[in-house]
């Protein structure tokens, strides 16, 4: 069975780009355009990994991250964001304990490698 990831981003182009890249690697991609949609779809779709934007209207990525972890502490969540300052990375990785912190723009190779690393043995 192919691994399934959810991309949560209010920019449809980002979801489409991730989908094109990862589906070429036999990784199923579900898009969600908000934190609220992510939380709804999470129960239904049961993703193996969530790639989560930080800057979104209504519920930002940090709030969404906390709600995801409350519901499913073992589910890997990587931040996928334009916020590339060292402070933001430290906050994401060391304070909030995100599983990874991927900054936009990312390369195809980087996204595939980091997604596979996060999925562990499920990818391939």
Q: Which functions belong to the PLM regions below?
A:
Residues 56:
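Receiver (REC) domain active-site loop signature in two-component systems and cognate sites
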Residues 33-37, 60-63:
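Acidic catalytic/metal-coordinating carboxylates
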Residues 45-51:
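Active-site beta3 strand of CheY-like receiver
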Residues 26-33, 41:
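Short hydrophobic/Thr-rich beta-strand motif most characteristic of the beta2 strand and flanking loop
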């Amino acid at each position: 069975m192919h691994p399934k990831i959810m991309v949560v981003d209010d920019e449809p182009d980002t979801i489409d780009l991730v989908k094109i890249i990862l589906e070429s690697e036999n990784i199923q991609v579900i898009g969600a355009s908000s934190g609220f949609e992510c939380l709804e779809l999470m129960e239904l779709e049961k993703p193996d990994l969530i790639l989560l934007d930080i800057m979104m209207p209504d519920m930002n990525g940090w709030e969404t991250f906390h709600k995801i972890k409350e519901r499913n502490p073992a589910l890997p969540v990587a931040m996928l964001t334009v916020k590339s300052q060292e402070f933001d990375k430290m906050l994401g990785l060391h304070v909030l304990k995100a599983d990874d912190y991927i900054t936009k723009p990312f390369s195809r190779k980087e996204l595939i490698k980091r997604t596979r690393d996060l999925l562990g043995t499920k990818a391939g």
